[in-house]
């Protein structure tokens, strides 16, 4: 385990790409122990000059879309291209143990054994916001360790699409054709955040369904406002199982990066993501500090009960809480 005495040496080993040190650094960053958090802050500050040169990808999709099969095929393609690949898999968590249920390593056999790959599951513990914070910090560790591509993967439910899109360069939505899932994706506003839509499982007797779904997505994209002026989102198809169409997806990602880098937009996006991350973390820290105050916690619960019982309007409750905070912290 990394400690104060070994921090400098651990940073050196991390910069050399030592997998064991990377795993230890991730464990340190994930720890909620106050001493570990203070040490991980020093670690993250020290590696920041070495971050920013990695391509950050987000991959999301509903259960059954074949994300693990796709990531296995895609990751192995990148390795054959001479690149180092890290996968950060934000998994659903066991409500009992808080641990990862799916265990992505067991579903990506070849990739997990590859020397140029690193896979790390991040249990969400039922709260995606906290998981996305850790995923962002783990991504920075991978960048400092010299990984060329970092992929953040999550289940496409709830707010997961926007959470992932806010921390990556290129956001990829993995879909399947048939069963109404294609239309459902359009209704969810998925099109507003996706840079690439990939329809998987274009194999067997599914070619017709895939072609219909592709036309549907392309039609929707043409009537929606672009996320970036420099980029028209593309709809691609593949069979991750048969490893077909994977190289076209990589070429499209390169086109995306080239277009946004040339205009300076990619740098702007990353800067804005950092600002939003700081703002969100500030809000969470302030709330944690407030609720750690027993007087505020008690007053909040009393106010909440009054609002529940309709003896106090939410607006008045908010005003009273604001006045309480003003008295406690600013007067």
Report residues per predicted region.
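Nucleotide-state-sensitive switch-loop elements of NTP-binding domains
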Residues: 6-57, 65, 71-160, 167-174, ...
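Short hinge/gating elements
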Residues: 10-11, 65, 122, 199-203, ...
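Long, well-ordered amphipathic alpha-helical subdomains in the mid-to-C-terminal portions
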Residues: 22-24, 237, 248-326
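P-loop (Walker A) phosphate-binding loop of NTP-binding proteins
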Residues: 62
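Alpha-helical scaffold elements adjacent to nucleotide-binding pockets in ATP/GTP-utilizing enzyme cores
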Residues: 101, 138, 163, 167, ...
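Short beta-strand/turn micro-motifs at beta-sheet edges
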Residues: 106-107, 183-188, 223-227
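Canonical P-loop GTPase G-domain recognition
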Residues: 196, 202-259
